[in-house]
């Protein structure tokens, strides 16, 4: 049992986190989830070590639910479950590094290409894996500059190309086109190509957009990653990574200690997050995901329009939940936890309310007077 001062410290931490949870708009974390029916699992020593599609010695796991989650996204990303393998990660960074790892094992002499708007985890990944890489310029909307990609790739036309396609860039939610990427590389004479789609935020709803962005397996992706906590919602970071089975077989090793194949990046893995993601997709279904996106998109459009009416130059990419605006001052950035680089942005995720949006709009417009 805790000492009174320790209990007080714990209570104060909860109050602080609860207050901060009610006033952040700058990072993509869904907030309207309710997983109380799942709390009983927290009393178990769950560990999803090993390949989720193989039996293993340790049985306190949620592998069956993890496989359901992978199968759901395989179908959503237009792939046959028999041809695609995947697992639940601890977030988008692990998914990106895993995709790059598979690419390096396929093409050890490859050059990796990604735009300047790419998430920082990709730069970390190429350094960890010692992949030679080239950073490509972005268009003003955050999408990769295909002309610059062609120019950069021409220098290394005799070597395989690994490209990270952003399906919703970190700051502007710009979406790269995997079909265009492959066409550009073919035009400069490169035929050995691996494309990894980073769909951290947009993965659950991108297949439902009209027009649908080109990013999935039918559009030439070799691997795809998405985050579970950003749009579907979870109390802890999580994600899913999927790839063609042929790529995964190159890294597979049999481990007697666990009685299973080692195909994942991490050994011990969270058994709780696959249950959360399973619960989310079973509760929502495709139609629920679509309706949730439409609600968020309407609020994002309203927010951008209201800011512009009040003299703030805000904009969105088509079908984006991210509202881009000029850099906000430090007091606003601190209170509302607004991500800021050369621009600031706010992200309307499930659980974001009109009251929150109005309060931020009022604060920003008052500072601009």
From Swiss-Prot:
Substrate binds at residue 119. Keywords: Decarboxylase, Lyase, Pyridoxal phosphate. The keyword Lyase applies. Its cofactor is pyridoxal 5'-phosphate. Transmembrane segments: none annotated. Its EC number is 4.1.1.22. It catalyses: L-histidine + H(+) = histamine + CO2. Pfam families: Pyridoxal_deC. Gene3D superfamilies: Type I PLP-dependent aspartate aminotransferase-like (Major domain). GO terms for biological process: carboxylic acid metabolic process. The modification N6-(pyridoxal phosphate)lysine is found at residue 230. Belongs to the group II decarboxylase family. Homotetramer. This is Histidine decarboxylase. It comes from Mesorhizobium japonicum (strain LMG 29417 / CECT 9101 / MAFF 303099) (Mesorhizobium loti (strain MAFF 303099)).
